[in-house]
Amino acid sequence: MSPRSQAKSAQIRQETQKRIAAAAFSLIAQHGFEVTSVEDIAKAAGVSKGLIYTYYKSKEHLLQELVIEALRDGEQVLPSIMDSPDPSVVLNNIIRWFFKQLRERPEEWRLMTEVTLRLDRYPFMHDIVSAKMTGYVNVMQGLLLKLGYEDPLGEARLLAALLDGVGIQAVVIREGYPLDEVEQAMLAKYQGDAGNHK
């Protein structure tokens, strides 16, 4: 096979894998992991069921790859939202980024919500999700420490729980959820003088 043919073949494989991942992502976000079958994914992607197993060992492996990709997307923006020496600006940026993601990527949040709420059913995901959550809490703890919070770890855990709760409610209630008002309330809660946090 010529280098040109190899490049074309690699491009086709990559496009096919992206199509499979996009179809799986959409179906699992809409209907849930357990209800969505490999046949459903194959049909939505316009490929054979057997072809899916060329790229993924199992449906669980496919879910794992989807979650890793979703988490990777979030990590790519972290340097830009943390690009300030002022911890209050960074915390503000994190909160704004979170709400922006809820508005712009609702399917991703539905998928992540299902996975995080059912980690007991997806033990293969537990370590990945737990490690990421610990990392996010550690980042927020560092910011809250600089802002003068008396218990920065406790407050970071509270903030993570608030964000999780908002995410779940937004996914469940959808259009009726007052995202703008909740965002403003959360921004107001975490702005102000360090002395007020003790």
Predicted regions and their residues:
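Generic hydrophobic, amphipathic alpha-helix propensity
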Residues: 12-25, 41, 66-70, 74, ...
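Hydrophobic alpha-helical connector segments
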Residues: 65, 79-104, 146, 152, ...
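Hydrophobic alpha-helical segments that form the core
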Residues: 151-172, 181-189
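Hydrophobic/aromatic residues within well-ordered alpha-helical segments
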Residues: 16, 59, 66, 70, ...
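N-terminal intrinsically disordered/low-complexity leader segments
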Residues: 1-15, 197-198
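Amphipathic alpha-helical packing segments from all-alpha helical-bundle domains
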Residues: 104-107, 121-147, 154-157, 184
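Helix-loop "lid/cap" segments that line or gate small-molecule binding pockets
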Residues: 80-81, 96-103, 112-121, 189
